[in-house]
Swiss-Prot record:
Protein name as annotated: Peptide chain release factor 2
InterPro entries named in the record: PCRF (IPR005139), Pep_chain_release_fac_I (IPR000352), Pep_chain_release_fac_I_sf (IPR045853), PrfB (IPR004374)
Keyword tRNA-binding: no
Lineage: Bacteria, Pseudomonadati, Chlamydiota, Chlamydiia, Chlamydiales
Subcellular location per the Swiss-Prot or TrEMBL entry: Cytoplasm
Family indicated by similarity: Belongs to the prokaryotic/mitochondrial release factor family.
Gene, per the UniProt record: prfB
Amino acid sequence: MHENFDKRLEVLLEGLALTRRSLDPEGKENELKELEQQAVQDGFWDDVARAGKISERIARLKQQLSEFNELKNKVSTIQFFLEDEESSKDLEMQKELEKEFVFCEKKITEWETLRLLSGELDRNSCFLSINAGAGGTESCDWVEMVLRMYMRWASSHSWRVEVIDRLDGEVAGIKHITLKLVGEYAYGYAKAESGVHRLVRISPFDSNAKRHTSFASVEVFPEIDDKIEVEIRPGDIRIDTYRSSGAGGQHVNVTDSAVRITHFPTGIVVSCQNERSQIQNREACMNMLRARIYQKLLQERLEKQNIDRKNKKEISWGSQIRNYVFQPYTLVKDVRTGYEVGNIQAMMDGELLDAFIKAYLVDYGEIT
């Protein structure tokens, strides 16, 4: 047991050193001090949008530094007790050390994933859309299951989730839903989920208990700020208004507050019914449209670069990326990386999604 702990400690110390270099806690401390000084200046809240972003950055810096210091202290504690021969032989102490090792190893893995997120927009919040494929009620039910997985996963990262647009299925489930994941590195993580997700199971809607295959497509695009210029000419868009169809209080189905914008040159369509007024929904739609057009331009640029990497791996936008098999056996397998797990319930609870994302980033991080 002691030898096993010693080897694991070596790995932890190496991981901690790499984390320190990539995180740069001293640099983060200096940035935090500068931002906190700005936050107490007169007129700070005159620009609410800017003040909000600075406040979020301050909170994120504090969280990162707190987590790093906690990790550093736990590794030091482990090292101290392993150097004490009497303590390291105690069975109760070994149980406590095992708990500390598991915590530190998980945290190191999280930091390792962050090191893979170096894209220009990886740090941004993002929009995530889920659409039902062919299969009627089956696919709508599958969309709702995928939504639950992402909601739980986002919660584990402490991201705020906003429902931008939603269309329920005629019998059950959801035909379409767009979320906004608000938090640092939301896009960096979520971009790995773009593509078609395939479900195989015995249908709860089939009285003959036959196996059915259902599909849900996921599209992820980053939120972009006003510094990034995206040209949208008035003549290139059509703006439609309609009555909201989802939950939203007294305004639902009372006024034509929901907004849909169609961009003719790209064929992109965005809609929003989450806000309480037509003006707010229109603004939200324009922000999404800018983000999707910019994402499309980035994809086209990547496709033209003809990047050689490993076995000349390619990304096919909108292609099938993952299979979820419930019957006759349980298996979740990513067709891009080959990574797979058998615990499908933990996967659908959002607990194993980060492992799939890390495998994707290791293989494709440099070209997305």
